[in-house]
């Protein structure tokens, strides 16, 4: 592969999306971008705080990482930034390795992601079974919810452990510091987020709920109708954040806020900082690097596929998307950011708000910059319990809880992989869950494929025994040739073996080795090994090894 020819294929979707771009499309993208930017701001702060970082780490990750992913990515509408899936991983890395090493592992993961896209390996991410993805997603959702109980309850806990069981112990030990004001704010936020969309649930023909529509007709209030429509488009997290922050400020409620814990949010871009790279450090961080890269790749490409389904726009380019994710994660750590990836909630909001191109993603970043510059001083009043309520809502929406109810209808393999990955994620960590889950998936796949290989004896005389082979003869199925070897060992001298292989679709090195051993056993007893109906792939394998010349074929 020559680098110049490959660079010719480096085509961000932004380049093709703006071809024939119109003013009408710009206004749609701008409106969608503003909406997504408003939604993204509280989420970015909440994800950073939940990860054990300062809120500005999430904000600048959303701005810088989001801009790079939109500008260079392979999806027209995907929105990038900090994601809930990374909360548990980042918190564990910071606790175990420290903040500086988080930045290094994120940058290294960016390099790995870029290389995956560069060598066109984006399709490999689809080989991760959906049962594993569902299991670790639900596990992460549980861990996010558990990690937010401290702030939801207003407990005075100096530092929360990343260990599942230790978190329960810490919460129990500090239960006496419960702050009822914080709990009330958090529960109000959570309840409001569930109720808000129900107030404006649209009716297909009218766009308003039947009850609201009747009320509008009764009072014939055009202005009220417009106000309701505008309210229905306002994101629930923003309504909860603004309302409850104002309530806390004016009533002077004694709860912990961003200001009391972090001292406020800087209004300037963080300075460029070069982490202390060394090969020894990089080697130490191999596991977190691979975890960040794998989760980022899976999360972003799943998100891009969802965007394709709901937007009706041309399909995303997975390799271009991975390269964009790589660039974003290589750059963001130098500004003190956290891992960035595609985010489903913000991407769906973008599509439903009318976004049609990466311009919407860039506008979402511009919106966040404007809001930060204008309103950063006000963020000091945001109660942490309200952010905890928002994250609990995110965790609820993140999980696929209905899958537990349908497990009895699923296959044993699906149940084993999903539940195994789920419990390993919760009890241990995502790295262990992914490693064990993928190994278990491979073992189950080999077992399933081995059952598809069949050996059937069709005839036997003192001179010749005939067998028909079906399926794929690979390392997981070679034991099924043992009955043929048993026949050879107990047969009279000079018996030949005929293998009808017209239904044998593939042959690997292990299968070839067993056939060679079988051939030697037959020849030692004065017989012949005959193949009838060899297909192209098995014939090619046998020919390259020289085995084909040693046997008879029909």
Which role fits each region the language model picked out?
Residues 458-554:
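Structured cytosolic domains appended to multi-pass membrane proteins
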Residues 1-453, 514, 546:
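Transmembrane helical cores of multi-pass ion-transport proteins
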């Amino acid at each position: 592969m020559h680098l110049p020819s490959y660079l010719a294929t480096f085509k961000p979707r932004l380049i093709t999306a703006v071809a024939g771009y119109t003013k009408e499309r710009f206004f749609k993208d701008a409106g969608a971008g503003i909406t997504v930017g408003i939604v993204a701001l509280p989420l970015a702060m909440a994800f950073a705080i939940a990860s054990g970082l300062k809120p500005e780490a999430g904000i600048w990750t959303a701005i810088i990482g989001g801009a790079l992913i939109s500008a260079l990515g392979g999806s027209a509408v995907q929105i990038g930034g900090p994601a809930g899936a990374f909360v548990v991983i980042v918190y564990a890395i910071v606790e175990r390795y420290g903040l500086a090493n988080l930045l290094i592992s994120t940058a290294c993961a960016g390099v790995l992601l870029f290389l995956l896209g560069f060598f066109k390996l984006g399709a490999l991410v689809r080989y991760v079974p959906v049962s594993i993805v569902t299991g670790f997603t639900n596990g992460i959702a549980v861990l996010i919810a558990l990690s937010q109980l401290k702030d939801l309850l207003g407990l005075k806990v100096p530092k929360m452990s990343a260990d599942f069981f230790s978190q329960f112990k810490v919460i129990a030990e500090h239960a006496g510091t419960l702050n009822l004001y914080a709990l009330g704010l958090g529960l109000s936020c959570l309840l409001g987020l569930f109720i808000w969309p129900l107030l404006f649930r649209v009716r297909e023909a009218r766009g308003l709920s039947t009850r609201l529509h009747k009320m509008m007709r009764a009072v014939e209030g055009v202005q009220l109708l417009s106000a309701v429509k505008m309210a229905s488009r306002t994101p629930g997290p923003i309504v909860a954040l603004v309302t409850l922050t104002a309530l806390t400020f004016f009533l002077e409620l004694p709860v912990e806020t961003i200001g009391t814990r972090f001292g406020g949010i800087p209004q300037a871009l963080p300075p460029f900082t070069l982490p202390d790279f060394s090969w020894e450090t990089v080697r130490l961080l191999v596991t977190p690097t691979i975890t960040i890269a794998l989760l980022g790749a899976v999360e972003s490409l799943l998100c891009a596929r969802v965007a394709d389904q709901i937007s009706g726009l041309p399909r995303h380019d997975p390799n271009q998307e991975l390269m964009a994710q790589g660039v974003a994660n290589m750059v963001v750590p130098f500004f003190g950011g956290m891992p960035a990836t595609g985010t489903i909630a913000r991407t769906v909001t973008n599509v439903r708000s009318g976004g049609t191109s990466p311009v919407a993603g860039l506008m979402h970043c511009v919106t966040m910059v404007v809001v930060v510059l204008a309103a950063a001083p006000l963020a000091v009043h945001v109660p942490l319990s309200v952010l905890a309520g928002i994250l609990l809502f995110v965790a609820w929406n993140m999980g696929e809880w209905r899958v537990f109810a349908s497990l009895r209808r699923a296959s044993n393999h699906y149940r084993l992989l999903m539940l195994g990955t789920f419990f390993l994620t919760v009890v241990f960590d995502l790295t262990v869950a992914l490693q064990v889950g993928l190994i278990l998936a491979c073992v189950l796949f080999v077992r399933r494929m081995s059952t598809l290989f069949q050996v059937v004896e069709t005839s036997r005389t003192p001179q010749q025994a005939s067998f028909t082979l079906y399926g794929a003869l690979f390392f997981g199925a070679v034991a099924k040739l043992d009955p043929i070897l048993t026949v050879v060992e107990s047969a009279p001298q000079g018996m030949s073996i005929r293998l009808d292989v017209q239904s044998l679709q593939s042959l690997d090195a292990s299968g070839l080795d067993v056939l060679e051993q079988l051939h030697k056993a037959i020849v030692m007893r004065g017989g012949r090994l005959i193949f009838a109906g060899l297909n192209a792939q098995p014939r090619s394998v046998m020919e390259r090894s020289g085995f084909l010349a040693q046997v008879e074929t029909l």
